[in-house]
Amino acid sequence: MPKVVLAYSGGLDTSVIIAWLKENYGYEVIAVTADLGQGEELAPLEEKALQSGASKIYIEDLRKEFVEDYIWPTLKAGAIYEGKYLLGTSFARPLIAKKLVEIAEKEGAVAVAHGATGKGNDQVRFELGVKALAPHLKVIAPWREWDIRSREDAIDYAEARGIPVPVTKKSIYSRDRNIWHISHEGGELESPANAASYDMLMLTVPPEKAPDQPTYVEIGFEKGIPVSINGELMDSIGLLEKLNVIGGENGIGIVDMVENRLVGMKSRGVYETPGGAILVYAHRELELLTLDRATLHYKEQIALRYAELVYDGVWFAPLREALDAFVDNTQRTVTGTVKLKLYKGNMMPAGVTSPYSLYDEELSTFGRDEVYNQADAAGFINLFGLPLKVRAMMEKKAGLR
């Protein structure tokens, strides 16, 4: 019997896909779950997958690889999609695709399958990953084939086959969770006119319910990578988990946004990224201290393109690798500590230090002129403004002004 390897989350979509693949393709279904830091959500998945009809399930602990090979490079790049989204779902998909391919080759499978809808970005991210790593594998996307047209239909399908699902018709949210974030879509969020109900939050308290006293936290970085909290060296997983707790308690990292999907439509989601928001803010503060103006400004342009690549699922591509090389070069001096003040959803710098600081107090303050002769500024301004002067003279001569 041919085998298919399914990216299995245990949620509504992939729960019904197991039965659907067996009924419509006659395949043996092997479920693969990537442990990216979902926590307690993973506990019932083995039993659930087997009860749903899978022949076996792999639950792979990919947390370390996820943080160090996917999150940290994106953090160093400063990549943020459309100024708000910290890419928590986006950079998880290429890693899942990579693991699907590895297990498909190990099992001798002829196909891989996923539960992404035909309207979303994830179908692109999964399938680009497979095309880049194993173009010979068939990819099955049930949402593009079956007669199920809504989550309500999927619930009916599951209930008719005795498949347990974690949602009801009255409370339907589509969620994606990993060690970096949790996303919420669906329900009242489908209308941008509706205020989000913060009852949905799982990692973060609403800012108004955060402590009335500020919390201070100090992050240590080595070459752009976070390595310590309040002076304590920590492994990557422990560091991010601890910052999630600290940020969550202080209402940090809640984003409600309407974004432009790759497939051409807009969508709305609420994202919780408490630890990630702290790291992005702290990393930026350290770069402001340690990078020269030209490099910093050019890197901002790179960050926009990097964010698009990650969002679009083009992770396994020469351009992303080339951009990583540029970013890594810029991070050689991004070493130091950043102290932040957290208060009711807000962050403020409370002290930044680095052995590679480019801030020179003698140059920056109004002290003596031995180091910086202010009279030199006149010549600089004359030369810097020369193109403006020449154009103004031309316009006057030509009667344009």
Curated annotation (Swiss-Prot):
Its EC number is 6.3.4.5. One of its GO terms (molecular function) is ATP binding. L-citrulline binds at residues 85, 90, 121, 125, 174, 183, 259, 271. It is an enzyme of class 6 (ligase). One of its GO terms (biological process) is argininosuccinate metabolic process. Pathway: Amino-acid biosynthesis; L-arginine biosynthesis; L-arginine from L-ornithine and carbamoyl phosphate: step 2/3. The keyword Transcription does not apply. This is Argininosuccinate synthase.
